Amino acid sequence: MPEGHVIHRLARLLNDAFAGEPVSVSSPQGTFAQQAAQLDGHVLERAEAWGKHLFIHFAPGNGGASGTVGGAGAVLGPERIVHIHLGLIGTFRLQPADVPVTGQIRLLVSDGTTVAHLHGPQWCRLITEEERDAAVAKLGADPLRPTDPDNLATLDDVHARVARSKRSLGSLLMDQKLYAGVGNIYRAEVLFLLGISPDRAGVGASREDKEQIWELLTDLMAQGEASGRIDTVRPEHTPEAMGREPRKDDHGGEVYVYRRAGQPCLVCGTPIATAVVEGRNLFWCPTCQAE
């Protein structure tokens, strides 16, 4: 499942391509056709991400007739935000409009120069501003909204809830009601980099633990948003520095423990351990992260 940095990067790319412009909107697959027709020709105001959720806001003014951009059309009603969650297999990509797009396309957005195409999302809905606010209210603090006042208020609550919890940090970090946008890779890598056992309970975590987890999530996810991949290894542990083969994985990036079960730790040589926590395989070093 794409982690939050992917969704924030996607929101930025959508804004770069379409923000402030009228766009054509369609659903070649047909599942979202009725909603797409309402949006067709309207101005795409902005895209935003909160955790793993993407919200695309459209202006309430007149839209174009079907298949046009910028013509006169119906006024858009209160349902003018597209809410997307990619789930495990969804993809949303941008490319030049003159390059053919294939496959089952749930949503197609274009300005004639660039096209964005959505495939296989967990959901793609047309919602109101109130429904967007309600969805965000259910989410925890987002490391990629470090200066958002609402997010910082949520973070204070998250730290308090973690401090009272008997659940392990390996479990808590996957809870989207606490850490919005954090997924399996960042969970494993952050705990390793801080030398924290994934079995440590929230109630047993120090204030420093919680603050360091948040700060590292903020830094690493910002790097991931900028580069489009997850890299967590320090310079001294890169393939070039260690004379080892680069990691070969569909997720890309150089990491310490994620999907490295049984392989030697890049720091101490201990075989990386794995266990299922919150329905996903968690990875850690029993030596570097000893409790």
Regions found by a protein language model. Give the residues of each.
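Basic, nucleic-acid-binding surfaces and adjacent catalytic neighborhoods in DNA/RNA-processing proteins
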Residues: P22-Q35, G67, R161-E291
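Phosphate/anion-contacting hairpin/loop surfaces
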Residues: V69-G195, A201-G204, I213
